[in-house]
């Protein structure tokens, strides 16, 4: 248990930040799931629109340090490639 006032304050801050980061991560996952379902349905325009909405959410999460920026870049790249493959198929 924290003995000093500053340690107790840090614990409070960590709790708030953890909740905030969990909410950001959950929101990002929701947007990615919308892209995944649009890809699975085979609808190219819906998938493209869903990706356009998901991209800023993912980049915002990276900017806030919730997930690494390279992880966001990789995931966006893979989603974009799948949507492009959907257009040619």
From Swiss-Prot:
<comment type="similarity">
    <text>Belongs to the bacterial ribosomal protein bS20 family.</text>
</comment>
<dbReference type="GO" id="GO:0003735">
    <property type="term" value="F:structural constituent of ribosome"/>
</dbReference>
<dbReference type="GO" id="GO:0070181">
    <property type="term" value="F:small ribosomal subunit rRNA binding"/>
</dbReference>
<comment type="function">
    <text>Binds directly to 16S ribosomal RNA.</text>
</comment>
<keyword id="KW-0687">Ribonucleoprotein</keyword>
<dbReference type="GO" id="GO:0006412">
    <property type="term" value="P:translation"/>
</dbReference>
<dbReference type="GO" id="GO:0015935">
    <property type="term" value="C:small ribosomal subunit"/>
</dbReference>
<dbReference type="InterPro" id="IPR036510">
    <property type="entry name" value="Ribosomal_bS20_sf"/>
</dbReference>
<dbReference type="InterPro" id="IPR002583">
    <property type="entry name" value="Ribosomal_bS20"/>
</dbReference>
<keyword id="KW-0694">RNA-binding</keyword>
<dbReference type="Pfam" id="PF01649">
    <property type="entry name" value="Ribosomal_S20p"/>
</dbReference>
<keyword id="KW-0699">rRNA-binding</keyword>
<keyword id="KW-0689">Ribosomal protein</keyword>
<protein>
    <recommendedName>
        <fullName>Small ribosomal subunit protein bS20</fullName>
    </recommendedName>
</protein>
């Amino acid at each position: 248990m924290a003995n000093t006032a500053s340690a107790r304050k840090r614990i409070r801050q960590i709790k708030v930040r953890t909740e905030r980061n969990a909410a950001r991560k959950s929101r990002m996952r929701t947007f990615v799931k919308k892209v995944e379902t649009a890809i699975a349905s085979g609808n190219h325009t819906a998938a493209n629109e869903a990706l356009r909405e998901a991209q800023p959410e993912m980049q915002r999460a990276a900017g806030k340090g919730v997930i690494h920026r390279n992880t966001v870049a990789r995931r966006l790249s893979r989603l974009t490639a799948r949507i492009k493959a959907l257009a040619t198929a």
